[in-house]
């Protein structure tokens, strides 16, 4: 079941930003987010893939690959409502839970329906779908993404019950960047990562070039991270293995052999891979944001002058600093 959603017209974006004094510049992005609705961010036409929970898991993951999307809302025909999201994280959890060896077919992936997987995986921990109204502010959207530790937030029309769009950190930051030059620049934009202490610098989850994919999947599950820097024997970053790379196992139908190294698994994208996107502690927040938006990536690896991994800065970290804490270290 696939749906293509088109809105009638391009949303009008307000140009009237509140007048800010130099002392209050640190809250300009917060004010911007509070004065714009989720609807303002929805494009004129966008494709949305929706899965019925009675669909086989395997077919659903192949459909994600075919449509070039990372997640899809789940529709329960019995309840006549959206009940959750199917994401690459589900694919990782299924592979990690049921993989035995390259010689044994993963029955659960081949035969389970989405609803069966959800019953097994969620058991008694069923949570209502986290979603947002198109009339809610972007500030509320950012708050919900960060508070619930999710990467995708469906925008659902409360009247029709239809899913209109899926908000992500990436799309929100890109929208903010379109108007960023219209604001007085907050003081914190010129400060360094080290000064602002934005990002994660302790217990960074990493893998070696020789780490088997199955072990990497276990790290994703245990640490709940979206990417793993791949390092050499000296701790220098040479690649990055992200959750998105895992879906390629479905694309190439190679998910029955998870004993191969992450380096081998990443060869599929070697012809267009431009290298790991990095940053340094002395670089300013403004520089970091520009790099993230221009490269359209979800995180940067913080390194020292020898390319040794020091931390990770994610879009979630950036939005939290810009919108929720006004450049201050997160509470």
Curated annotation (Swiss-Prot):
Protein modification: Phosphorylated by ULK1 and ULK2; leading to negatively regulate AMPK activity and suggesting the existence of a regulatory feedback loop between ULK1, ULK2 and AMPK. Glycosylated; O-GlcNAcylated by OGT, promoting the AMP-activated protein kinase (AMPK) activity.
Polar residues bias locations: 1-12
Binding site residues for ATP 1: 70, 85-90, 130, 151-152
Any one GO molecular-function label of the UniProt entry: AMP-activated protein kinase activity
Residues engaged in binding AMP 1: 85-90, 130, 151-152
Entry binding sites for AMP 2: 70, 170, 242-245, 269, 277, 298-299
GO terms, biological process: cellular response to glucose starvation; cellular response to nutrient levels; fatty acid biosynthetic process; import into nucleus; positive regulation of gluconeogenesis; positive regulation of protein kinase activity; protein phosphorylation; regulation of carbon utilization
Domain CBS per the UniProt entry, residue ranges: 43-103, 125-187, 198-260, 272-329
Binding site for ADP 2: 70, 170, 242-245, 269, 277, 298-299
Superkingdom of source: Eukaryota
Binding site for AMP 3: 151, 200, 205, 226-227, 298, 314-317
Motif (AMPK pseudosubstrate): 138-159
PROSITE patterns, per database record: CBS
Annotated positions binding ATP 2: 70, 152, 170, 242-245, 269, 277, 298-299
Cellular component terms (Gene Ontology): cytoplasm; cytosol; membrane; nucleoplasm; nucleotide-activated protein kinase complex; nucleus
Chain positions recorded as ADP 1 binding sites: 85-90, 130, 151-152
Subunit and interaction comment: AMPK is a heterotrimer of an alpha catalytic subunit (PRKAA1 or PRKAA2), a beta (PRKAB1 or PRKAB2) and a gamma non-catalytic subunits (PRKAG1, PRKAG2 or PRKAG3). Interacts with FNIP1 and FNIP2.
Family note: Belongs to the 5'-AMP-activated protein kinase gamma subunit family.
Domain comment as written in the entry: The AMPK pseudosubstrate motif resembles the sequence around sites phosphorylated on target proteins of AMPK, except the presence of a non-phosphorylatable residue in place of Ser. In the absence of AMP this pseudosubstrate sequence may bind to the active site groove on the alpha subunit (PRKAA1 or PRKAA2), preventing phosphorylation by the upstream activating kinase STK11/LKB1.
Protein name stated in the entry: 5'-AMP-activated protein kinase subunit gamma-1
